[in-house]
Amino acid sequence: MIKYQLNKNYENIKDFLLNIKDYFKNNSNTIHKARNELKVIEYKGIETVVKAFKVPNILNQIVYAYFRDSKAKKSYQNAIKLKNLNINTPKPIGYIEFYRNFLFKESFFISEKLDYLFTIREPLRNNNLKDREEIIKKFVAFTYNLHKNCVYHKDYSAGNILVFKNKNDEYDFSIVDINRMEFKNIDLETGLDNFAKLWLDEDSLKLIATEYAKLVNINEEKSINILKNCDIKLKSFVEFKRKIRGKN
């Protein structure tokens, strides 16, 4: 059994979606492989990024079959929501889920490939990058717009924020890995805490907190202190987990 949804703008590549397991297996253009795997696959002149989610354990095969939406489905639905809010994310093409013996098995999310310059990691780590400060300030404005639209990306790490030039030749941003998102009102601390996973140095932290303070119209020092506390809390938690696992 399969379940799927295909964006109406891509009806001409329905065959690609329905046979994605074969196309994925026979393609060697892997761009990321960890828990999940991403490949760039061209079909009928469209460059796509196909994300194959890891088959879950037996308990979660039951959970995803009957009680919870899959990560592939949430990725697609969240992409549609973002597009409706005019927030950049690669164009969603569709998702598909495969079931065997009434259990959830493989799942895939397909989007159009976005050509980008680099991830936000580059300006955050490279102080000599051209237009660094401009990019970071625009990134803060982009994030503020997410929060203003009640969008909270729960995996807002540097590798999930793509930097590109838009049609006006201005720096712009696009978010990926969007299956874990919440749509809710975002208060000041929650908004600043959203930056913590970027693993900021002192200079970037102050610049981001200062710019965010201007946008939300609060005292800059207050904003810096809140983000510092969020940053320390996350780094301490990660360090604690490393020690528990014996990775000093």
Where are these regions (language model features)?
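Juxta-kinase regulatory segment immediately upstream of eukaryotic protein kinase catalytic domains
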Residues: M1-S28, K241, R245
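Conserved ATP-binding subdomain of kinase catalytic cores across diverse folds
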Residues: L18-F118, K148, G246-K247
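C-lobe/activation-segment region of protein kinase-like
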Residues: E170-K247
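Short loop segments at secondary-structure junctions
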Residues: K113-D115, N166-N168, D203
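Short acidic, glycine/proline-rich loop/turn micro-motifs
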Residues: L59-A65, R121-R125, N185-E189
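Proline- and acidic/polar-enriched loop/turn elements at helix boundaries
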Residues: G94-Y95, A158, N168, N225
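Active-site acidic catalytic loop and adjacent metal/ATP-binding pocket
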Residues: L38-I41, V49, A141-F183
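Conserved kinase catalytic-core helix
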Residues: A72, N78-N88, R121-G159
